[in-house]
């Protein structure tokens, strides 16, 4: 599996951990469901935080695809830190994370 990262990854611990979890989940899903060989990550700083786009070179998602356990758990982690997560399944899988710098307090 190849992973191509464009931009930089935030070094703030909470943001970096969620980004890592997202990339790992997308690699797993690319192998299991899309039968792809490459995951593309775009990560860039925006006002107040970071935006991350993740997609792959695999097969188009089946009609009616939805978030499973791994993506749902990722969504919970993102929202717990005050971020947003968008998933799109058409025409290709796309995961978008918007993560604030600082997040929420423990």
Residue ranges and their predicted role:
Residues 1-8, 51, 85-88:
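Conserved transmitter core of two-component histidine kinases
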Residues 2-23, 65:
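Conserved short strand/loop->alpha-helix "switch" segment adjacent to the catalytic nucleotide/phosphoryl-transfer site
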Residues 16-39:
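Conserved ATP-binding N-box helix of the HATPase_c
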Residues 35, 46-48, 89-91:
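Structural motif
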Residues 38-48, 55:
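Short beta-strand/loop element within the Bergerat-fold HATPase_c
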Residues 55-61:
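Glycine-rich acidic phosphate-binding loop
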Residues 63-94:
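ATP phosphate-binding glycine-rich loop and adjacent ATP-lid/helix-beta elements
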Residues 91-103:
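Short C-terminal beta-strand
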């Amino acid at each position: 599996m190849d992973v191509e990262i464009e931009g930089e990854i935030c070094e703030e611990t909470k943001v970096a951990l969620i980004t890592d979890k997202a990339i790992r989940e997308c690699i797993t899903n690319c192998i299991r469901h899309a039968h792809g060989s490459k995951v593309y990550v775009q990560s860039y700083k925006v006002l107040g935080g970071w935006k991350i786009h993740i997609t792959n070179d695999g097969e188009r998602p089946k009609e009616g695809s939805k978030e499973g356990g791994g993506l749902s758990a990722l969504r919970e982690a993102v929202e717990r830190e005050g971020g947003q997560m968008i998933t799109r399944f058409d025409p290709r899988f796309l995961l978008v994370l918007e993560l604030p710098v600082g997040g929420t307090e423990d």
